[in-house]
Amino acid sequence: MFLKFCLWTMFFFSAWSPIGHAKYSSLLEVVTPLRVTVTRGNNISPGWLSYSLNIGGQRHIITMKPKKNLISRNFLLFTYSDQGDLLEQHHFVQNDCYYHGYVDEDLESPVIVNTCFGSLQGTLEINGTSYEIMPKSSTSTFEHLVYKMDSGDSESSPMRCGLSEEETAQQTKLQESNAPTLLQIPYENWWTHHRFIEYFVVLDHKQYVHRNNNITTCIQDMLQIVNGVNGYYLQIDTDVVLTTLEVWNEKNYINVELSIFKVLGDFCTWKQNMFGNRIRHDIIHLLVRQGYGLYLGLAYLADVCTPYNCGVSSVLSDVMSDMAHIVAHEMGHNFGMKHDGIGCTCGLKDCLMAPYKTNSPKFSNCSYEEMYSVVTKRSCLYDIPEALVTNLTVCGNKVVEEGEQCDCGNSESCLQDPCCSSDCVLKPGAQCAFGLCCKNCQFLKAGTVCRKEKNECDLPEWCNGTSAECPGDVYKADGIPCSGEGYCYKMECHQRDEQCRKIFGNGSRSADEICYMEMNRQGDRFGNCGNDSSTYRTCQIADVLCGQIQCENVIQLPQRRNHETVHYTHFSNITCWTMDYHFGITIDDIGAVSDGTAYAPDHICVDRKCVSKSVLVSNCSPQLYHMQGICNNKQHCHCGVTWKPPDCQKRGHGGSIDSGPPPLPLSHSKWIVYILIVLDVCIVIIIYLFSFYKLSK
């Protein structure tokens, strides 16, 4: 019990108020970055980029160079098979499109952007004000949107650590006495040593689903986050290198819906049981798409390079700069940085390690001093991640690794396995050991459905007959009509009637338009078009059907969660029912009209606004598939049952280049049966006639 108590006291409650969760106070303007030539003296600096931007009526030049050491050369990606087997990959990742720089030759004004998709996306700071830049959709002139990032009154609800200074000192003493890797560095030289953080990240299942079940998108997200984190850690001469990423693509392997304090402990225990010291890492973080009330993150204090080098971050925002700030703050705790208090300064109003969420990019003098007390005693921080090695490839650990066909575990388990032998190769006659297209150690025949469509906006996938893996999950492209007047959006056919039924049960339906007009123009918790963390936004008339869902014909109130409140109001003999949404709640607002819900002909709701369906940019058009199919979410043609991909121009059996080959149409099978029957009849007749001829002769 004492040991358990000690372990629990070895963390720092890095709890933040969600006040200041990254948002945009207003659209500053539309800008068109102009590429300019960079010179240093008389020579053009290789790899550097410069763009001219006109922001707020002033011309600024941002100068950037590629960020090196963003991802290790031997980057490891872990995913899971549908049967729960851990799969290891050495994944190639594009990492030459991430940049760091500055504005107008001011080295104190950071620029953190990426150009991976041919445009600028990231953050920059001008005269102490932070801005987010992102590409404008549907533009052919390289237009970008520039927003001012506003954190509001971030001190209005500060959350601070509950540990006393004496308890913190005891923890630090205990950590140092148990530290396995110590390296004393003379004080005068410590800052000249460049440090590397080998960063291991785990993404939970909700985040994977939120990113459309796309592993590549998850990797791209993490690179943007790590690029942002590196922008903060440049000032302390530290490279944060993404060495390992695990995606819980099948399910969560711990319960992330408990308190954040329990989740942190469970995650660290899971990490030690799952990997131990087999995967080298200095810090490991779990990023979850889960709200924890007022808390955005939690991490153990000063435990970098120890078995308790863990942290948890709630990533409910899709703004990568916001997520990077949360991760950087939690990583600071792993480095030994406490929350800033009186006397801590960085030249700005707030610093990065403030107890509440800010947009500050700078560490305080206190953070520097606290970090020094840790980094001088951690030799692991001076290892170069490019030399990363892993000894995880061990036959018999039930993990299918590179070079293995299967892994059935110990000898006893392998005796019961019909497909896999104890030396991690397939048994004679076996084609496979796992996978949605594997049955009885054999590949399922081509055309066997391995993933049925979940709903009318989904698409099926079929086995190809030569692989145990089912093709990746694809679905109908956003904007395709569904259920009469609806449109498919992110694999769902969003409709107000259906949303009302999900909230209030069968029989309920979307209310009369007067409910939307009266309620959503009030701008309160029961009727609004979103909020700015301090005030609710009143819906414009054109957007009222995209605000809070308003329902009628509610027969029986279903049991809701504790933080949810049902509200009803009468207008013109109509009872309008809706759900409220409180400030400080970090889960999705279930009472908001779902993105993708149809508004009017060729219009949908997106982010509480009525927008043209044309915002759903697609490179796939009816002309591309010759009017004989539909587009999928990868912008490829999914052909009808009698047409052949990729362009549905020739006769075939349907499907797409992403779905696998569909089965032979039943009509074709019937024709084959008919032909065989006719042939059999003909053979019988010929034999009969031949026999009759011989007898008559």
Swiss-Prot record:
**Record lineage:** Eukaryota, Metazoa, Chordata, Craniata, Vertebrata
The species is: Mus musculus (Mouse)
Signal peptide feature range: 1-22
Main localisation: membrane
Which PROSITE patterns does the UniProt record give?
Answer: ADAM_MEPRO (PS50215), DISINTEGRIN_1 (PS00427), DISINTEGRIN_2 (PS50214), ZINC_PROTEASE (PS00142)
The catalytic site is made up of 330
Q: How is the cofactor bound?
A: Binds 1 zinc ion per subunit.
Q: Which GO terms describe its molecular function?
A: integrin binding; metal ion binding; metalloendopeptidase activity; metallopeptidase activity
The record, for SUPFAM superfamilies, names: Blood coagulation inhibitor (disintegrin), Metalloproteases ('zincins'), catalytic domain
Q: What sections of the protein cross the membrane?
A: 672-692
Q: What protein am I looking at?
A: Disintegrin and metalloproteinase domain-containing protein 26A
Q: Which residues form the Disintegrin domain?
A: 392-478
Glycosylation positions in this chain: 127, 214, 365, 391, 464, 506, 531, 573
Q: Which residue ranges make up the pro-region?
A: 23-187
Names of the cofactor(s): Zn(2+)
Q: Which residues lie on this side of the membrane: Extracellular?
A: 188-671
- Specify the Peptidase M12B domain's residue ranges: 195-385
Q: Give me the Gene Ontology terms describing cellular component.
A: external side of plasma membrane; sperm head plasma membrane
Q: Which GO terms describe its biological process?
A: cell differentiation; proteolysis; spermatogenesis
Q: Which UniProt keywords apply?
A: Developmental protein, Differentiation, Disulfide bond, EGF-like domain, Glycoprotein, Hydrolase, Membrane, Metal-binding, Metalloprotease, Protease, Signal, Spermatogenesis, Transmembrane, Transmembrane helix, Zinc, Zymogen
EC number(s) reported in the record: 3.4.24.-
Q: Which InterPro entries match?
A: ADAM_Cys-rich (IPR006586), Disintegrin_CS (IPR018358), Disintegrin_dom (IPR001762), Disintegrin_dom_sf (IPR036436), MetalloPept_cat_dom_sf (IPR024079), Peptidase_M12B (IPR001590), Peptidase_M12B_N (IPR002870), Reprolysin_adamalysin (IPR034027)
- Could you tell me what this protein does? Sperm surface membrane protein that may be involved in spermatogenesis and fertilization.
Q: Which residues form the EGF-like domain?
A: 616-649
Q: Let me know which tissues express this protein, per UniProt.
A: Expressed in sperm (at protein level). Expressed specifically in testis.
